[in-house]
Design a protein with these regions (language model features):
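Domain-level signal for Mg2+-assisted phosphodiester chemistry and nucleotide/NA-binding surfaces
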Residues: 1-118, 168
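Nuclease catalytic cores that cleave nucleic-acid phosphodiester bonds
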Residues: 96-212
Length: 212
């Protein structure tokens, strides 16, 4: 019987890292990743390096992503909402997508308060990922909990989850044989298993839909 695997996805980190690595020079939206496809490819990559007793199946995918506000970019806001709806369709109870509004500086133009697009940035997504990682590791519903992110600020969350949780805590990363920086891992108190995902896994994770 396969082990139950839950995956916490730091979406922009996973998406943009893959875009830079495998599709340099292309618009990031061409490298859009479908979370369930990604988790399935992660399971496939992990299973290829484990024996029959340690095979996993995707049981839950928690996705956290920044969301442009409509006052700044109504088209991007609409696309993000459409993507969330598409990614969760058919995966009720398995895939959850949490969109957190981006943070902005504001300015007044002709007396109207407007967001400064160049100032927008994700805030709090890493905290949400950390909290979910620990919760999933502790809840007792999953055998394996994987963090998909290269954000080193999440190392303490991995340590906490591994130390206090009931599940086996792991990480996932993109790997390219020609890029030395992809050979490393997030440094934690004790070495955690990290599944390396390749360009083929990336291509099989892509969302084929056009949200324009």
């Amino acid at each position: 019987m396969a082990l139950k695997m839950a995956v916490v996805v730091d979406y922009q980190n996973v998406h943009l890292t893959a875009a830079d690595l495998y599709m340099p020079g292309c618009p990031p939206e061409e490298a859009l990743i479908d979370p369930y496809r990604f988790a399935s490819q992660l399971a496939q990559a992990r299973n290829a390096t484990n024996d029959d007793a340690h095979q996993v199946e995707v049981s839950r995918v928690e996705v956290f992503r920044g969301l442009p506000i409509p006052e700044d970019d109504s088209d991007a806001y609409r696309r993000n909402q459409a993507q969330k709806a598409q990614w969760t369709r058919g995966h009720h109870g398995v895939v959850n997508v949490t969109l957190r509004p981006l943070k902005y500086s504001w300015e007044y133009i002709d007396g109207v308060r407007r967001p400064v697009r160049s100032s927008r940035q994700e805030k709090g997504v890493d905290v949400l990922c950390a909290l979910m990682l620990v919760d999933l590791a502790r809840c007792g519903l999953y055998d394996v909990v994987v963090l998909a992110s290269r954000d080193t600020d999440l190392a303490p969350a991995l340590d906490n989850a591994a130390r206090t949780g009931r599940a086996k805590v792991e990480a996932a990363k993109w790997y390219h044989p020609g890029v030395p920086s992809t050979r490393g891992r997030i440094k934690t108190e004790r070495r955690l298993w990290t599944t390396s995902m390749t360009e083929q896994h990336f291509l099989s994770s892509l969302d084929p839909l056009d949200y324009a």
